[in-house]
Amino acid sequence: MTQLAIGEATPHGATYDGHGVNFTLFSAHAERVELCVFDSRGNERRYDLPGRRGDVWHGYLAGARPGLRYGYRVHGPWQPAQGHRFNPAKLLLDPYARRVEGELKDHPLLHGGHDEPDYRDNAAVAPKSVVISDHYDWEDDAAPRTPWGKTVIYEAHVKGLTYLHPELPQEIRGTYKALGHPVMVAYFKQLGITALELLPVAQFASEPRLQRMGLTNYWGYNPMAMFALHPAWASSPETALDEFRDAVKALHRAGIEVILDIVLNHSAELDLDGPTFSLRGIDNRSYYWIRDDGDYHNWTGCGNTLNLSHPGVVEYACECLRYWVETCHVDGFRFDLASVMGRTPTFRQDAPLFAAIKACPVLSTVKLIAEPWDIGEGGYQVGNFPPPFAEWNDHFRDAARRFWLPRNLTTGEFACRFAASSDVFKRNGRAPGASVNLLTAHDGFTLRDCVCFNQKHNEANGEENRDGTNSNYSDNHGKEGLGGPLDLMERRRDSIHALLATLLLSQGTPMLLAGDEHGHSQHGNNNAYCQDNALTWLDWQQANRGLTTFTAALIRLRQQIPALTGDSWWEEGDGNVRWLNKNAQPLSADEWQNGPKLMQILLSDRFLIAINATLEVTDIVLPEGEWRAVPPFAGEDNPVITAVWQGPAHGLCVFQRG
């Protein structure tokens, strides 16, 4: 058998230098590593990796070029009780693969074995890693670096956002190309968002259970290859990387940042009955949190949990993040189930991965957003992430819904959440922007469904409506479903307007779910992770244009209010905020805790938000001075209101002084 040259231990993965390819693989417990390369007919040739520096195996294959398909067979002990599951019969993906050929199918040959190893060779059906050359001309691309105080995030799915857009060329709808098309860029600018946050774009797989049901994983939270773009949204797998970078470049030219939702908490290998295609066969003990009995700690609900306190896995995670920043110029990340990142196994603010990110000059300067929980003991960590992380604020989400949709919530609690939840986030030197405020997200009801459904309707997911949360804090306004008489539809509209105004005019970083500005509905499905169909795709032809205009006007208004864009905590007497009752007097202690849901919020001494969240029309006395309602609550030529606003039930209006 031909020998490989010894090569180098860095950089990690498969690196083409113009003359050949250097291969590396981390495995602390392997006894031998074989590089397997495949020709166009699927014939396999194996080479032992001859070099080892620390826990990194390496070798250099002269003459190898981009397009070469390869994988690894890793030899070592089969000792499940100790967490070792080496099985050289299974061809394994390179964790650093930049491109993958083939899908992860529900095939018996892909299972490595439970108690005993499965020695059937899987090369015929296993996905293959592919060597790439990632040269790209970024021209004059520059990161927008929008300050947190001026950031407005728009969470979207690559396919669902554009698949039904009638103004886009048919062949690019639902693809990376569509994201940077002038039609979409113009829409983003008109709406006023500053950052496009994409659901996972790293290559993912559909779980075997879904495949057997004829469904697919639509959202993408089942990662298969963390460095490779999901190929289904590109013209071809070969062009995916450049098409994505073209989109990033176009968005940057328009001043729009790109944030990636990334899944560093588990892999698509799932539990012990899941497929063995990469990490489990490379070094199960190092990559995953292993219980004393050899099974996995399942703090993710997905069968396994990545051990992000292990030095080799910390390095893997950081290199992955740096790859997306340096090679694809993304501007930040939203981390799924991010409490896993801080597990040691208990959560710690000085966990190894947090320390590594903070020390990295590349990663510490991009936007980092945590989903601050997992399902394990001690997994709920809202407010506890270290700088420079921002966090999804579920306190804001729940409080906004409970305030405007008939639930029990005090004025004081609402004000606290409106003020960026300072009781939660004003620590460790963090600014208000650390509170990422949201009403809705990809998981849960859409905003329209929040006002149309009291109960989830997830039957299409095939789990007899057991999946998805039951804590929706929603209100159908008297009738379950989308339709209803005119007065009911008007009440729903008013609730949506009030909720959007609360989101977009509160302190903190607002995140808008794509489609909420259209009135998009998922017909009560609050867990549409497996619905790659018209239920989740945005229907641009049926979009509520008036609601879109209303939302855009709110975002424009937000950018005019220094108290919101300054990203500094409000202090008494600083001129940023005053909290008033319906008579324009400071709220009393009793009104904060027991009063009706009536208040006025004066921002920057110029903008007044009058709130009537009661069920009755109520007169609200405005502060001294001349006030006029501003768009989207009135036209440009608005009469001056000098004294009283007659606030409709569940109503909100914004006035500007003078």
Curated annotation (Swiss-Prot):
Protein name: Glycogen debranching enzyme
Pfam assignment, any one: GlgX_C
Organism: Salmonella newport (strain SL254)
Its job: Removes maltotriose and maltotetraose chains that are attached by 1,6-alpha-linkage to the limit dextrin main chain, generating a debranched limit dextrin.
Protein family per UniProt: Belongs to the glycosyl hydrolase 13 family.
InterPro entries hit by this protein: GlgX_C, GlgX_Isoamylase_N_E_set, Glyco_hydro_13_cat_dom, Glyco_hydro_13_N, Glyco_hydro_b, Glycogen_debranch_bac, Glycogen_debranch_GlgX, Glycoside_hydrolase_SF
Residues under site feature: Transition state stabilizer: D443
Active site feature: D336 (nucleophile), E371 (proton donor)
Lineage: Bacteria, Pseudomonadati, Pseudomonadota, Gammaproteobacteria, Enterobacterales
Catalytic activity annotation: Hydrolysis of (1->6)-alpha-D-glucosidic linkages to branches with degrees of polymerization of three or four glucose residues in limit dextrin
UniProt key word Hydrolase: yes
GO molecular function, one term: hydrolase activity, hydrolyzing O-glycosyl compounds
Any one of the GO BP annotations: glycogen catabolic process
Keywords: Carbohydrate metabolism, Glycogen metabolism, Glycosidase, Hydrolase
E.C. no: 3.2.1.196
The protein's enzyme class: hydrolase
UniProt-listed CDD domains: AmyAc_Glg_debranch, E_set_GDE_Isoamylase_N
Designated gene of the protein: glgX
Pathway participation: Glycan degradation; glycogen degradation
Positions of the UniProt region annotated as Disordered: 459-484
Top-level taxon in the UniProt lineage: Bacteria
